[in-house]
Amino acid sequence: MAQHHLWILLLCLQTWPEAAGKDSEIFTVNGILGESVTFPVNIQEPRQVKIIAWTSKTSVAYVTPGDSETAPVVTVTHRNYYERIHALGPNYNLVISDLRMEDAGDYKADINTQADPYTTTKRYNLQIYRRLGKPKITQSLMASVNSTCNVTLTCSVEKEEKNVTYNWSPLGEEGNVLQIFQTPEDQELTYTCTAQNPVSNNSDSISARQLCADIAMGFRTHHTGLLSVLAMFFLLVLILSSVFLFRLFKRRQGRIFPEGSCLNTFTKNPYAASKKTIYTYIMASRNTQPAESRIYDEILQSKVLPSKEEPVNTVYSEVQFADKMGKASTQDSKPPGTSSYEIVI
């Protein structure tokens, strides 16, 4: 008899730690931001349930059995969970909808039943992630040596998230950075980056032919840009040199022909003198020698000139010979004396 009780005690000692371990085990539950998540309770005998109390940082809700044909009744005890919690029958699984980042954390469910062990505790850890968008592949380093494209590819998501892993196919490389040594024989390959977190995954691809084309185009663009800059520089130097030589020429011309000189006066207004010249016609004496047939006298006007030029007036004055003078000799048979001009400027 004593031996029988000893075997029962040993059996209880073996099963108690196992039951305690089950109660203290933490289940990880992953949820997606803005969507719903389910906490699995999985009660084997729903009719034995009296009440389930849910707590987190604060009290969350408690669940009581409904009628035989209705779902369990949920009473929310914290305002942050209003209209976002319901329970599924018949296993009393708890559902939280419209997940927020602040919902993440530890949760505990105390399950009270009518039979032994009367109270069972289950623990959960809720992790919330964003659904990943399409990753982006960028070329962070490019080089081309001996017809080989050496490219460093970087794969990234729009918002850096926790627990995001990257994988490259067909190479099977892990990590968001991939170093490629592309040869002409491998131009038909396509590299695919897959970003993944515990709740979602997405991918993007790029062809090897596109990589090498982008490298060649990049070098051509760089070379063309450099030539354009050099051409603009030489054009600017040519323009500045032309302006400098022109100004130097004008300065030297001003030194050779200073302002006020006859050349400058004539160059600026070659018709100014003719507009201000007055001619006087005077008959010369018959005894005037042929060598002295014309006499020019130039008289300069005052330096102060009127602002507006007056019209040119020509005055002719004729002098008649006296009646007592005889006829001229044969040598003087030419027209009576040549006219003499008096020029007034």
From Swiss-Prot:
Phosphorylated by tyrosine-protein kinase LCK on tyrosine residues following ligation induced by agonist monoclonal antibody. The association with SH2D1A is dependent of tyrosine phosphorylation of its cytoplasmic domain. Phosphorylated on Tyr-296 and Tyr-316 following platelet aggregation. Phosphorylated on tyrosine residues upon high affinity immunoglobulin epsilon receptor aggregation in mast cells. PROSITE patterns: IG_LIKE. It is found in: Cell membrane. Keywords: Adaptive immunity, Autophagy, Cell adhesion, Cell membrane, Disulfide bond, Glycoprotein, Immunity, Immunoglobulin domain, Innate immunity, Membrane, Phosphoprotein, Receptor, Repeat, Signal, Transmembrane, Transmembrane helix. One of its GO terms (biological process) is defense response. The modification Phosphotyrosine is found at residues 279, 296, 316, 341. This is SLAM family member 5. It comes from Homo sapiens.
